[in-house]
Every structure is written in C-alpha cells, then in structure tokens.
C-alpha cells in the first residue's frame, strides 16, 4: 500500500514505461508518440490513484458495488472530458431517473393537450350557437310596433304651428 502511494515509485514506473515505449517504437518521425505517452501516463496515474481510493471506499462504505460503479463512471467521464468529448457515461440508475422525468413531463403535456382540446371543442360549440343565433332569416312582414324609435313619431303636419321643434332658432346674446 505504501508503494502504491509513493510519488518516487510512480515517477520511476512512468519513466520505465516511457523508456519501454521509446525502445519499442524507434521511429523518430512518429508524430503521435507524445500523445500516446501522455494518455498512457494519465491512465497509469489514474490507476495508481484509484487503487487506494477504492480500498478506502470499500472499507468505509457498506454498498461496495455502487461505490465502485460510481468511481469507474467518474474516471471514464474524466477521461472523456480530457479527450475533448462532450458525451458522458451514465449508469442505469441515472438513465432510469431521466426516463421517469421524461415520462412525467410527457404525461403533464398530454393532460395539458387534453384540457386545451376540451376547451377548443367547447369554444367551437359556443361559436356555432352564436352563429346560429346571428343568421338572418327572411321575414315577409316586419312588425315595427315593437321598435322603440318608431313610437310617437309626428310628421310636419302633426306639429303644432307647423314648425319643427328640433331645429335651432336664432338667438342673440348681449355682449
């Protein structure tokens, strides 16, 4: 356990790995070697760092499977972010939670559509009744006795003194 957390041991293993890679690949023109070495270095460092963390986590918690799964998912997501990917690895629990949230949202939207559809049907029925009430029906004789503006109409002959009482007369005012 002490060797795993020792920085000198880690650096010597990294140096050994780089020397081994240099001896295997002797082509000096290989352009991707620094990238491969960097990825392998990061993987080795994560491996060295994750072993003590896993041992402590397993001893401290009772649910070892979930802790290991969470650690592995976190490590993979970190590697994906380092590589420049925007995608992430999710566990089945997270997928189920997201699916439950999506199903709830779809149910809420379906209920809203149902309410709106019911309201629209009611509005169409109301508009139909209003339209039916506004349709003009041809009538042969119109009874004008019930019209308010047709009561008590006097003609020019029926007015007193033959003058229209509603026409203005000339008024002079003193100044």
From Swiss-Prot:
Maturation and modification: The N-glycosyl content is primarily Man(9)GlcNAc, with a small amount of Man(8)GlcNAc.
Residues that hold Ca(2+) according to the record: 120, 123
Intracellular or extracellular location(s): Host rough endoplasmic reticulum membrane; Host membrane, Host caveola; Secreted
UniProt-annotated glycosylation sites, renumbered to this chain: 8, 18
One of the record's GO cellular component terms: membrane
InterPro entries in UniProt: Rotavirus_NSP4
Description of how the protein assembles with itself and partners: Homotetramer. Interacts with the immature particle in the viroplasm. Interacts with host CAV1, early and late in infection. Interacts with host integrin ITGA1/ITGB1 heterodimer. Interacts with host integrin ITGA2/ITGB1 heterodimer. Interaction with microtubules blocks trafficking to the Golgi apparatus.
Recorded family membership: Belongs to the rotavirus NSP4 family.
Functional note: Plays an essential role in the virus replication cycle by acting as a viroporin. Creates a pore in the host endoplasmic reticulum and as a consequence releases Ca(2+) in the cytoplasm of infected cell. In turn, high levels of cytoplasmic calcium trigger membrane trafficking and transport of viral ER-associated proteins to viroplasms, sites of viral genome replication and immature particle assembly. The secreted form acts as an enterotoxin that causes phospholipase C-dependent elevation of the intracellular calcium concentration in host intestinal mucosa cells. Increased concentration of intracellular calcium disrupts the cytoskeleton and the tight junctions, raising the paracellular permeability. Potentiates chloride ion secretion through a calcium ion-dependent signaling pathway, inducing age-dependent diarrhea.
Protein name in UniProt: Non-structural glycoprotein 4
Species this protein is from: Rotavirus A (strain RVA/Human/Australia/RV-4/1977/G1P1A[8]) (RV-A)
């Amino acid at each position: 356990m002490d060797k795993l957390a020792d920085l000198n041991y880690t650096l010597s293993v990294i140096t050994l790995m780089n020397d081994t890679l240099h001896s295997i690949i002797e082509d000096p023109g290989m352009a991707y070697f620094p990238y491969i070495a960097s990825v392998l270095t990061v993987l080795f460092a994560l491996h060295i760092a994750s072993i003590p963390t896993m041992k402590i986590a397993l001893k401290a918690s009772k649910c070892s499977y979930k802790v290991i799964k969470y650690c592995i998912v976190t490590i993979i997501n970190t590697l994906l972010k380092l590589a420049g990917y925007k995608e992430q690895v999710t566990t089945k629990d997270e997928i189920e939670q997201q699916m439950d949230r999506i199903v709830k949202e779809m149910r809420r939207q379906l209920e809203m559509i149902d309410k709106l559809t019911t309201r629209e049907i009611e509005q169409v029925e109301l508009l139909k009744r209003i339209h039916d009430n506004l349709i003009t029906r041809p009538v042969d004789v119109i009874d004008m006795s019930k019209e308010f503006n047709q009561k008590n109409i006097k003609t020019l002959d029926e007015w007193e003194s033959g003058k229209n009482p509603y026409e203005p007369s000339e008024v002079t005012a003193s100044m």
